[in-house]
Amino acid sequence: MAVSRWKAVGSTLLAAFLVGLVVLIAVLLIRTYTLPTAVRKWNRNESLITELAEKERKQLVEALKGAIRIPTVSFSEEEQNTTALREFGEYIQKVFPQVFSSSLIQHEVLGGYSHLFKVQGSDHNLLPYMLLAHIDVVPAPPESWEVPPFSGEERDGYIYGRGTLDDKNCVIGILQSLEFLLKRGHKPRRSFYIGLGHDEEISGHKGAQKIVEKLQSQGVKLAFVLDEGLAVLDGVIQGISQPVALVGTTEKGSVTLDLTVNRLPGHSSMPPSETSIGILAAAVSRLEQNMMPNMFGNGPEQDMFEHLSTKFDFPLNIIMANLWLFSPILSRILELSPSTNAIVRTTTALTIFKAGIKSNVIPPTATATVNFRLHPAQTVQEVLDIVQNTIKDERVELSVLNSFDPLPVSPNDMSLGYHILQRTIHDVFSGPPVAPGVCVGNTDSRHFVNLTNSIYRFSPVVLKKEDVDRIHGLNERISKEAIELLVQFYIQLIQNSDTDNIPPPHLDTHEL
């Protein structure tokens, strides 16, 4: 009797489990294949100016080559190639005569080498917007490059050189698009600004910040800001076979710390039990071994995966459409790669270590510099508290060299700027899915937070996996086709921005 009862209970439990499992699978599949996505149905305006003549294609390629040949390198906040920066200002005046002579455009130089343009629109009731790019580039030691990094050499359909992807492509693209539109007699309805900073790679304090101060003094407010950032990624996101456009709606914050240990000096023949180097090495080792907490789901990164859920291959599409269940698993998977780990947490990077001058002298001081890139859900103070609690050694002194909190998350639902950007991406890049993302690096746009709540970071280029490492790396390059599309993007964006409304959202469902 007892055995029979237990068998009956066991059968009931098994049946309940199987029913629950079937229900769970049904819920997962229904959400996966019917999850609605809010999209806006744009009607492409065929009357817009978009096509480029063969002569214009050659002009824009030569314009970029010439820009690359000017080595506008930012070495540090104290050292820039100011001769090259001055030369670059002269160069763009020569290459874009319509931009610098049009009665619609006001131009001024700020901070010595940065450029601010105002393009006057016909409708003063429309809030202006801002296009940003930067003139300066990071250093490019010629060793291991296939071509000299400042040659602007063309090879196999690609233009090589430092700045072809970051960010002279956008500088030339913006100015060239405006030049072509002016030649065609185009007069914008909505006013807009163009800001070209000269020190983005070293903080933007003398360039972009001066532009912001100028606009604030005039009481300017902006509908949106578009700066460099994410891109159309082709084969970069594992599990998605089609190109995907990611628009940065925020960027991580940053804290740079000096960790210092001071001890008595001595001779290596009579070493103490602990030295400044040993104490500091133990401290930075604790920081590396104890990563900052995984913050997946507390910032906009989850939004990105949900937006793209229907684009993932099976079975990843089920996981992405059901993050209410699978987010703990996904967050652990994302930790496994440095590129995706940077999305889910504040990263810790030991960048400089200084100690000692002689092999037989125990140094009194050891210093390490550590850079943290802050997840959007954390603040500078929270990170400093975690660092203190992780090191747990009063002999290690902390000093903040520079810091700023993560940028506010810009809207991607009812924002005019986001949907103009989305529309332009669809027009130019043949309709890839568009999703919000997080910029793990920093841009000049961070200085503009008091002028608008809509800041977007998107570079209008298609990047394959092998292209990503070229940015700030070896053999940076861009194809001639890509630079043509980039110019067409800005031409289209300027014209699309003349609207004063956006279409209502429609629910795009993927039915079983």
Swiss-Prot record:
Belongs to the peptidase M20A family. It is found in: Secreted. The lineage of its organism: Eukaryota, Metazoa, Chordata, Craniata, Vertebrata. Glycans are attached at N45, N81, N450. Its main location: secreted. The active site is at D136, E200. Residues 1-34 form the signal peptide. This is N-fatty-acyl-amino acid synthase/hydrolase PM20D1. Zn(2+) 1 binds at D166, E201, H472. Disulfide bonds: none annotated. One of its GO terms (molecular function) is aminoacylase activity. It is an enzyme of class 3 (hydrolase). GO terms for cellular component: extracellular space. It catalyses: an N-acyl-L-amino acid + H2O = an L-alpha-amino acid + a carboxylate; an N-acyl-aromatic L-alpha-amino acid + H2O = an aromatic L-alpha-amino acid + a carboxylate; N-(5Z,8Z,11Z,14Z)-eicosatetraenoyl-glycine + H2O = (5Z,8Z,11Z,14Z)-eicosatetraenoate + glycine; N-hexadecanoyl-L-phenylalanine + H2O = hexadecanoate + L-phenylalanine.
